[in-house]
Regions:
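N-terminal Sec signal peptide and the immediately downstream disordered periplasmic leader
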Residues: 1-12, 17-79, 85-90, 203, ...
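Outer-membrane beta-barrel architecture
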Residues: 18, 86, 107, 171, ...
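Acidic, small-polar-rich N-terminal luminal/periplasmic segments of exported/outer-membrane proteins
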Residues: 41-180
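Outer-membrane beta-barrel translocator/receptor signature
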Residues: 122-124, 136, 145-148, 154, ...
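Flexible glycine-rich, low-complexity coil/linker segments exposed to the extracellular/periplasmic environment
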Residues: 343-348, 409-434
Length: 434
């Protein structure tokens, strides 16, 4: 095979050589015309320069030595990328996936979360919003809103971006308010499964020095799956995203930016089918417990920038809070289902239910960066910075298990008031009132 392939290459090369000799005079005659045409083509064709902040300074992507993927808002729009999970399809080396129905795993080049972790475990891929470190991994479940671009940096980034960036960093850059004039757009999407999605973004110049940009995304969609026991619609979507961004020009070379972003999800939850579920349809399952999923995520940020001449001073501060509430069938089966294989073959599944699991994640950050505008001694770019970080996680799991397998179905129907239980529930959680 190798000899045959080599023969073909040599044969084609010979023909090309002969062809070049035969038409060489013609090429010389047309050389001037071709040169002029090529010059015109070069003038009319140019590659758009992409500006990124991968090294905490604005510079052309072609000048950055790091491995960076920069995705513009137009590219995200064209490819229908609406959240972090969608980035996996178009970003080399990046994996973002939903896990266990309400959590997210993320890795870059295999470094990060490959399996689900507990509520306080942090991935090895850092998330930033307009340069502000976002600590809660529940923020990966939010929808994109009014994005300018997304930068994905592959490889260790701890020197510039700090903790949790061994695998890399994702930086989401939002569109800035502008004082150039009023600008707005809105659209409505309607699809199958009852999908109704509305979006809008509006820029308002308040004065010569103050402008604001406000955006919203509202999504409603029926579920893709059904629980045949209680008729619950699963894998549905009921999301709302809001963002308000304000830019104040405090001087000729300084500015203050204030923004607030809010995301809320109130869904029935994800379809997590058990291994021995008897329903043949992959989009149907049989579970005796109802499920519920609620997530609220909010961030208030402030960014102050001033040009000092030789360097640029940037101060970033934020307060963040993520609240999550989950109810689910933790055994993934209907009461009475048995193990079909393995060491427990023939034995029934132990009924279990989260009633509920809750997490409250509160974060405060304060960061100062001084970034050189001109190289030191003509060849050294430098950055000096400091970061204050306060991160608190409060996680509660109330799990009910029928260890004796004597449960009646109506005792674990998911109808209960969270945190309000009779005293008997402490010793007998399967009492009907628990």
């Amino acid at each position: 095979m190798r000899g045959k392939m080599t023969y073909k290459i040599l044969k084609n090369s010979t023909l090309l050589f002969l062809f070049t000799i035969l038409i060489s005079n013609t090429i010389k005659a047309d050389e001037a015309i071709e040169t002029n045409n090529q010059s015109s083509l070069n003038n009319s064709f140019s590659i758009e320069e992409i500006i990124v902040t991968a090294e905490k300074r604005s510079e052309s992507l072609q000048d950055v030595s790091k491995s960076v993927t920069a995705l513009s808002s137009d590219e995200l729009e064209t490819k229908n990328i609406i959240d972090f999970v969608g980035l996996s399809a178009i970003t080399p080396g990046l994996t973002v996936a939903k896990n266990e129905g309400y959590k997210t795993v993320i890795s870059i080049r295999g470094v990060g979360d490959e399996t689900n972790q507990n509520a306080i475990a942090a991935p090895s891929v850092a998330l930033h919003m307009d340069g502000i470190f976002v600590a809660s991994k529940f923020s990966l479940r939010t929808d994109f809103i009014d994005i300018e671009r997304v930068e994905v940096l592959r490889g260790p980034q701890g020197t510039l971006f700090g903790q949790n960036s061994t695998g890399g960093t994702i930086n989401v850059i939002s569109k800035l308010p502008s004082s150039d004039g009023f600008e707005g757009k809105a659209d409505l999407t309607v699809g199958n499964y009852g999908l109704v999605k509305s979006r809008g973004s509006f820029n308002f110049p308040i004065s010569d020095n103050v402008s604001t940009r406000n955006s919203f995304v509202i999504t409603e969609r029926d579920g893709f799956s059904d629980n045949v026991i209680n008729g619950q619609d699963l894998d549905d979507a009921s999301h709302i995203s809001l963002r308000s961004d304000w830019l104040i020009e405090t001087g000729d070379s300084s500015s203050l930016r204030l923004f607030f972003q809010y995301f809320d999800a109130d869904n029935n939850g994800a379809a997590m089918k058990g291994l021995d579920d008897k329903t043949p349809n992959p989009r149907k399952l049989a579970q005796d417990s109802a499920s519920d999923y609620k997530l609220s995520s909010e961030i208030f940020g402030a960014i102050f920038e001033v040009d000092l001449g030789a360097a640029n001073l940037k101060i970033l501060a934020s307060t963040q809070e993520d609240d999550i509430y989950v109810v689910r069938d933790n055994d993934r089966h209907n009461f009475g289902d048995v193990h079909a294989s393995g060491p427990l073959e023939g034995l029934p599944y132990i009924a279990a239910e989260f009633r509920p699991e809750t997490s409250i994640v509160e974060t405060k950050t304060f960061e100062i960066n001084i970034v050189s505008n001109e190289p030191l001694f003509g060849s050294i770019d430098w950055i000096v910075g400091a970061l204050y970080f306060d991160h608190e996680i409060e996680n509660h799991i109330y799990e009910v298990k029928d260890v004796n397998n004597v449960k009646l179905i109506d005792l674990m129907d998911g109808q209960f008031t969270p945190y309000v239980h009779a005293p008997i529930c402490a010793t007998n959680p399967f009492e009907g009132i628990c």
